[in-house]
Amino acid sequence: MTAAQVDDGAFLLDVREPDEWAAGHAPGAHHVPMMEVPARMAEVPTDAEVVVVCRSGGRSGQVTSWLMGNGWDNVRNLDGGMHSWAAAGREIVSENGQPARVL
């Protein structure tokens, strides 16, 4: 799925590391680092569209496959990750007081 195809109502699951998240993420995204997903999978809805994102699409692709293998059928990977999100002109916010950017 491309950044332009992501519906505003989608549950955006950002699986990047805390420093990547703090530097810049999509507004309203939910942060669960990749290695924490198995322990925190109850936070991921089964009744809404879920779009998984990382920096470039690799980690999010792995998480998408893992979720699908564990019962989620409403999960899509964001092709190109946050790099494609930013390139598409989608909004990015930061948590560290610096201008938002993709690490």
Question: Whereabouts are the PLM-identified features?
Answer:
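Rhodanese-like catalytic fold shared by cysteine-dependent sulfurtransferases
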Residues: 1-11, 17-49, 60-103
